Amino acid sequence: MNPDTPQTMAATNAHKDIPGNPSTVMSSRIMLNDRSNGKPLKVLSETDWQFWVHNGYVVVKNAVPREQALRTAAFVWEFEDKKPDDPATWYSAPRAEMQMKELVGSGMVEVYNHQRLWDNRQTQRVYEAFTDIWGTDQLWVTIDRANLNFPLRPGDTFKGFIHWDYDPETKPQNVQGVLALADQTDENMGGFQCIPELFRTYDTWKLSQPADRDRFKPDITGFEDQLVKVRLEAGDLLIFHSMQPHGIRPNHSKDKVRIAQYISMMPAEENNEALRQWRIKSWKERIAPEGYAFPGDPRGWEQNKYPVAELNELGRKLLGLDRWSKGKG
C-alpha cells in the first residue's frame, strides 16, 4: 500500500455532492420516535424529551465516562501529530483538499475506525440515547471522524458557518450527533452552534426565501441573536435533528482547543447488503468514507499504524457485522 495514497471508499451516488455522511442512508424509512409505541425512555428524562421535541436537539450528560472521553482526546492529538501543551505544533497546512469549502479551517480530523472511536460508539449509554430518539433497538452507527478546533490566529479566515447536511425540503428522517472529548463550557472556544428558532419555523421561513436559494446554507438574516452556543463537558453527547440548522463556531479563545467526535445512529438497513458490506470493509480495512465533505488522510496512518478495532457484541451489531434480526451475518 502506498502511504501517500488516500484510502477511501466510494460513496453512494446520493452522497457525492452533499455534506451528509455516506456510511448510512440519507433518510430512514422508519420515522423518528413519536412515543406512540408506548416504550419507556431508557436514557432521556421526560424533560429531556420535551426539550428535544421543541428545540430539535438534546444533550445527554455523561454519555461516556469522562476518563474515556479524555483518552479519546489524547488519541486525536496523537493522530494529528500535535502536542496539547505546545501551541507551536498546532498549526499546519491541510493534508488534503476539502471540497466542502466552509469546512476549511474548521479542524476536521480524518480518522474513522480507531479503537478509541469505536469504544465510544459501542458504549451502552450512547446507544440507548439513540434508541430513545428512534424508538427502535435495531440501529447502525455512523462511521465518522473527529474535530480539533484551534484558536484563530491573526489573519485566519474561518468565520464559522450554519448549514444543513441534508436538504430540509426532503424532510429527512435522520439525526446527527457530537460527543465532547474535552470541556467546551467557554462560548468563545468554538464548538457546536445551531438555530432552534429556524428549526421550529422552517416551513414559514422558507416562504420568504427565493426559489433558487441554496438548500444547504440558509440566509440567517434576522436570526443572528437566535444562535445557540451549546455548552458541553467531556463525555457529553449532543444529538440533533437533521432539520436543525447547525455548524461550527470560530474559536476566539486564547489557548483553549475544542475536541469532539461525531457519532450518530439510525435504523439498521439490513436488507441493503451493498451498504452493509461497505461498512464492514471500512471497519476492517480502516478506510474512510468518500464524499463531498470527506477527503480522507493522505498519510494512510489508520491502515499503517493501527490495528482493526475490537468490537463487543453491541458494536458488531451497530456496524452490521452481526445482524440484529438473525444473529451473525
Protein language model regions, located:
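Short, conserved beta-strand element in jelly-roll/cupin
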Residues: 167-187, 231-234, 239, 264-267
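Non-heme Fe(II)/2-oxoglutarate
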Residues: 15, 29-34, 82, 210, ...
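Short, surface-exposed loop/helix-turn segments at secondary-structure junctions
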Residues: 158-163, 211-224, 255-257, 276-282
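Extracellular structured ligand-interaction cores
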Residues: 57, 143, 172-178, 189, ...
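Non-heme Fe(II)-dependent double-stranded beta-helix
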Residues: 2-54, 61-169
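Double-stranded beta-helix
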Residues: 184-247
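Short, solvent-exposed loop/turn segments at secondary-structure junctions
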Residues: 65-67, 147-148, 167, 184-186, ...
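Short, structured patches in soluble enzyme cores that scaffold and shape functional sites
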Residues: 145, 150, 164-166, 175, ...
